[in-house]
Amino acid sequence: MKFIIKLFPEITIKSQSVRLRFIKILTGNIRNVLKHYDETLAVVRHWDNIEVRAKDENQRLTIRDALTRIPGIHHILEVEDVPFTDMHDIFEKALVQYRDQLEGKTFCVRVKRRGKHDFSSIDVERYVGGGLNQHIESARVKLTNPDVTVHLEVEDDRLLLIKGRYEGIGGFPIGTQEDVLSLISGGFDSGVSSYMLMRRGCRVHYCFFNLGGAAHEIGVRQVAHYLWNRFGSSHRVRFVAINFEPVVGEILEKIDDGQMGVILKRMMVRAASKVAERYGVQALVTGEALGQVSSQTLTNLRLIDNVSDTLILRPLISYDKEHIINLARQIGTEDFARTMPEYCGVISKSPTVKAVKSKIEAEEEKFDFSILDKVVEEANNVDIREIAQQTEQEVVEVETVNGFGPNDVILDIRSVDEQEDKPLKVEGIDVVSLPFYKLSTKFGDLDQNKTWLLWCERGVMSRLQALYLREQGFNNVKVYRP
């Protein structure tokens, strides 16, 4: 099988040296992602496209899906590469490829040509289009908005029959811009803002301020791992968890009610800036949107920014909540965000929307900054790829099995889309579908006399969810890894 990767248009308008660097980085990213599926595949870069060739036909859909999620790719063409002799030969090959698709449909032919030939692209379009129209009686030519567009590419003596076109996510390849640290909470905003910076070519590390114990951290780890695995797995990134409960306790005890929200955000920015400086990261990323909550007015945002020299990026600053939720739905984080535990440890009864710098600084003089230094020093930093391994250690009490007994039921916790694409069928045992984001509310409705074997494709989500259910008091869960 063969795929032609078309570059994001903004890459093609760069200078020659920058364009070549971007293409080289994108080629490396594609190799890093796809080597997990087929170690024998070849990735070859050209001036205006990248070729991916693989032998394992069983991995075709998986490879195609992975390519649509790599930043820097505008679209992917799945092609059949064949030699040709003349225009009539092109027509005959197109007829074999497209006959079934064109039955009863309107169509047009679009051709791109590279190399020296005694015909033009328009000549091929007319010849092939006329031939298809004559040989498929129920088909009809329509040049604007046809039901089917027959895409052909001619390069020297090779014909590329386009079997399918699939849109990528665009943007710049990860690694073409500098690293950033995303302040991730697991909600709608921070997930979308992290994705937007990945799409713009940044390697995104994650910093999580834990206000709610193990269950909260498990949920946020799931979101961070999902974002990395889906859009940024070409690079290693860090997941830094900071236990912020001592800081919250100090704020609740010593800070005036109306100033709590702004001061908490200032403490988070101070802590994140220290982490960023430690690892050489150039900027922080937050999901703040103008006016969404009291701490996100221009006055308050300016005061929050003042505590650090580190650049703070807010890609969602002008977005409304509906737009953010729609983006979360597109990238697959909506269900995580909807079921994420809410921990509002610092809730002011009358939060200020226009904080005064002198008052904020006066309140912060009451704060013991050694507490902040200590929680940053004790921050837990892991390679995001180790989240799965670390979860294995944490869920020692949850048994992992590769077989099943008479009282066992497999619980497929993948998302609905994944279940529809690859239904799970295991001979000799019932399989029940319950997406991971419904476990917290629906698992208790299942037959608790059964032993439930949680399963997902890579085993990360099933382990995290097993730990979560154990914490909720459900002891009839195991992890299924055949």
Curated annotation (Swiss-Prot):
InterPro entries: Rhodanese-like_dom, Rhodanese-like_dom_sf, Rossmann-like_a/b/a_fold, ThiI_AANH, ThiI_fer, ThiI_N, THII_Thiazole_biosynth_dom, THUMP_dom. CDD domains: PPase_ThiI, RHOD, THUMP_ThiI. The keyword ATP-binding applies. Keywords: ATP-binding, Cytoplasm, Disulfide bond, Nucleotide-binding, Redox-active center, RNA-binding, Thiamine biosynthesis, Transferase, tRNA-binding. Coiled coil: none annotated. Its EC number is 2.8.1.4. It is found in: Cytoplasm. SMART domains: THUMP. ATP binds at residues 183-184, 265, 287, 296. Residues 404-482 form the Rhodanese domain. The active site is at residue 456. Belongs to the ThiI family. NCBIfam families: ThiI_C_thiazole (TIGR04271), tRNA uracil 4-sulfurtransferase ThiI (TIGR00342). This is tRNA sulfurtransferase. It comes from Shigella flexneri. The gene is thiI.
